[in-house]
Amino acid sequence: LDDHIVWAKFSGASWQGDGFYYSAYDAPQKGREFSNVNSIQKIYYHKIGTPQSQDVLFYQNPANPMRFYSVYVNQEETMMFLTESGAGSGNNVYVRDLRQPNSQFIQMTSNLDLQYSLVETIGDKMYFLTNDGAPKNRLMVTDLAHPGFNEWKTLVPEAKDMLESVTFADGKMILNYMKDASSHAFV
């Protein structure tokens, strides 16, 4: 591909349709490439085969210029998640129903000191690994009709060992716990 993206920083890529979303900053002034302060991270949509100058600005939040933002579109391209971080040790999550034209992001969480990691989406259900109310993590589930954190239900409660990760595969959940400095997986 001839596509080349510059000034993307603290970014991944999330595919949707014939392009992807990425996070970037404005190009710094000449001579300040390595000393410029990163502020007002923006999310753009890049269509494959087009120059970066044609990328569409998708999201920015000038009211919080030092925060980081990323977008994730689930595999079915039915939900889009916006993650906000940089003002604490955690993140906030917002969701948007892509099946509804012109839908807006709905805030799911509101504590930047806690962590919320999307594990999987199945139909309208969303599964999150979080330390909210569980310092050693727990797995919670919610759906698009009830995305606010107060509506989430605990699926796997906090245990005495740290729940490091959860993977969904072949209709099963694989729970990975840290115990005595070694990983232990349970199906």
Task: Describe the role of every protein-language-model region.
Residues 1-187:
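Peripheral, non-catalytic segments that deliver or gate enzyme domains
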